Amino acid sequence: MINSPRVCVQVQSVYIESQSSPEEERYVFAYTVTIRNLGRSQVQLLGRYWLITNGHGRETEVQGEGVVGEQPHIPAGGEYQYTSGAVIETPLGTMQGHYEMIDIDGAPFRIEIPVFRLAVPTLIH
């Protein structure tokens, strides 16, 4: 597998206070991912891998097929967006990972997802 510059991934996270319970060490975050296909041919997302790290350094790995129950085809010049969630035990944490994808010819490649922060807004100065 190779990393491909043909696909761009952007992530934005938000704290979900209404579903969180700090007294029970439960902090809920939603994250919205936008995947843009900058190439000249269609690609398909087959799988995902996430490394979720809480504020104590405890790591959780999550992997599986597709995202939110789909294995989307993303046309040349197109984009795919989805929202999912993560629950951690601390008010600060991070996520990072990669997507396993194939191009129109079935050749596999990997798209790295850079680290992004999960943070309760009142903790960020």
Curated annotation (Swiss-Prot):
<dbReference type="Pfam" id="PF04379">
    <property type="entry name" value="DUF525"/>
</dbReference>
<dbReference type="GO" id="GO:0070987">
    <property type="term" value="P:error-free translesion synthesis"/>
</dbReference>
<feature type="domain" description="ApaG">
    <location>
        <begin position="1"/>
        <end position="125"/>
    </location>
</feature>
<protein>
    <recommendedName>
        <fullName>Protein ApaG</fullName>
    </recommendedName>
</protein>
<dbReference type="InterPro" id="IPR007474">
    <property type="entry name" value="ApaG_domain"/>
</dbReference>
<dbReference type="InterPro" id="IPR023065">
    <property type="entry name" value="Uncharacterised_ApaG"/>
</dbReference>
<dbReference type="InterPro" id="IPR036767">
    <property type="entry name" value="ApaG_sf"/>
</dbReference>
